[in-house]
Amino acid sequence: MMKWFMSTNHKNIGILYIILALWSGMLGSSMSLIIRMELSSPGSWISNDQIYNTIVTSHAFLMIFFMVMPFLIGGFGNWLIPLMLGSPDMAFPRMNNISFWLLPPSLFMLLLSNLFYPSPGTGWTVYPPLSAYLYHSSPSVDFAIFSLHMSGISSIMGSLNLMVTIMMMKNFSMNYDQISLFPWSVFITAILLIMSLPVLAGAITMLLFDRNFNTSFFDPMGGGDPILYQHLFWFFGHPEVYILILPGFGLISHIVMNESGKKEIFGNLSMIYAMLGIGFLGFIVWAHHMFTVGLDVDTRAYFTSATMIIAVPTGIKVFSWLATYHGSKLKLNISILWSLGFIMLFTIGGLTGIMLSNSSIDIILHDTYYVVGHFHYVLSMGAVFAIISSFIHWYPLITGLLLNIKWLKIQFIMMFIGVNLTFFPQHFLGLMSMPRRYSDYPDSYYCWNSISSMGSMISLNSMIFLIFIILESLISKRMLLFKFNQSSLEWLNFLPPLDHSHLEIPLLIKNLNLKSILIKF
């Protein structure tokens, strides 16, 4: 037991992150099912809108901070990056340990905040004055703020660790453009986290002081401005959505490269520059979340055009994935299915994002279900599809076992139908101007809402099926005999790898024939 509590091994800590993420994911999914059951027909089921809004808030926090980030950055980052770089472990193993162990208490505090009344029914954005003491007079929002602080500290420590690992523990003679795409994506994600999280910490600390110490940062009666909070929050919030998707881009790139049988992804260097471009542009478009707060027309014009420009590097990535698949004979195995599903659905989410980047259109669509449909296409079918496809793809590496291929294909089809049936109708609801975060609606919206709720039940069944498939493989212990057609360093290990895969950092030597030889020195 102490092996897990005090471990400084990147593989053990990666497994802990994955377990926490799975647990939080089940919790967050349960909350989304409660939301969809409430909305499956007109009329009230929960009969208390404060509780409904609390469920919406908790669903968002759980999925973002305790499911996607621990899975992609903590889980896969810890597990795969040292193996892909050929390094013995992370740069700061003990810091790695504490950056995980800050997450369970943070999760506990988030769940504890729901036990007070009024519970935090603010939405994940926690806008004042709704989150101020006047409208949430219990300690609930304070607990949520402390939870955010702890997970933020955890993320910053994990990011520093990953950055130093990628910069200092790669092969000594390797150039940066030779580092594979997943370490690159996590490196850029770490930069985004380190630059954006302190701004969030400042914003929620000011909110904490407004609530408890009678300051008025966000209170107009004392000369403050609630719009200041929105600017600070979204300066973190927009890079955050790229933090959620960029590691997924890196993982999907590896899967596409491996499954197409190519030695490298199409336009490897362009892919790196595209991710750098996305990371940079992500910081200068935050006010597109605020088109309705009364921005100046020139400001709206700037944020509209800057947001549209983000589509360019994203399009480069999508077409490079498709170009990598071009010309190879596709046998539709499970990794290819998931990667193609990711590319297709993420692209749909990107196109609805282009629609919303127009400030004139966004004035109409802001805070409707069109926005919910958009960001669930890029998160629930971008980030989550990246997580599931990567988990299935690297499961034989992590455990040395095989999943049941036929069942996985059935599960993929169920999931694909379920998520599309859930979120595609929400665009229609948004165009019919159904607002977000409301527990009841006129019966003119009944048809699409009932279809959406049916889709969420299909998705739930597919996730239960996936858990069953994983448990079945762990119980039956089918070992993997042959591994082939892999272009990445991590597959050169035993399956599962030893606790310490590399005892020292390898050296890459290029001889006169320009063939690379990997030797230990």
Swiss-Prot record:
Enzyme class per UniProt: translocase
The record's free-text note on cofactor binding: Binds 2 heme A groups non-covalently per subunit. Binds a copper B center.
Organism domain of life: Eukaryota
Keywords, alphabetical: Calcium, Copper, Electron transport, Heme, Iron, Magnesium, Membrane, Metal-binding, Mitochondrion, Mitochondrion inner membrane, Respiratory chain, Translocase, Transmembrane, Transmembrane helix, Transport
A single GO cellular-component term on record: mitochondrial inner membrane
Keyword Transport found: yes
Residue sites binding Cu cation per the record: H238, H288, H289
Pathway assigned in UniProt: Energy metabolism; oxidative phosphorylation
Entry binding sites for O2: Y242
Record-listed Mg(2+) binding positions: H366, D367
Residues given in the record as Ca(2+) binding sites: E38, G43
GO biological process terms held by the UniProt record: electron transport coupled proton transport; mitochondrial electron transport, cytochrome c to oxygen
Subunit structure: Component of the cytochrome c oxidase (complex IV, CIV), a multisubunit enzyme composed of a catalytic core of 3 subunits and several supernumerary subunits. The complex exists as a monomer or a dimer and forms supercomplexes (SCs) in the inner mitochondrial membrane with ubiquinol-cytochrome c oxidoreductase (cytochrome b-c1 complex, complex III, CIII).
Biological role stated in the UniProt entry: Component of the cytochrome c oxidase, the last enzyme in the mitochondrial electron transport chain which drives oxidative phosphorylation. The respiratory chain contains 3 multisubunit complexes succinate dehydrogenase (complex II, CII), ubiquinol-cytochrome c oxidoreductase (cytochrome b-c1 complex, complex III, CIII) and cytochrome c oxidase (complex IV, CIV), that cooperate to transfer electrons derived from NADH and succinate to molecular oxygen, creating an electrochemical gradient over the inner membrane that drives transmembrane transport and the ATP synthase.
Family: Belongs to the heme-copper respiratory oxidase family.
Protein name as catalogued: Cytochrome c oxidase subunit 1
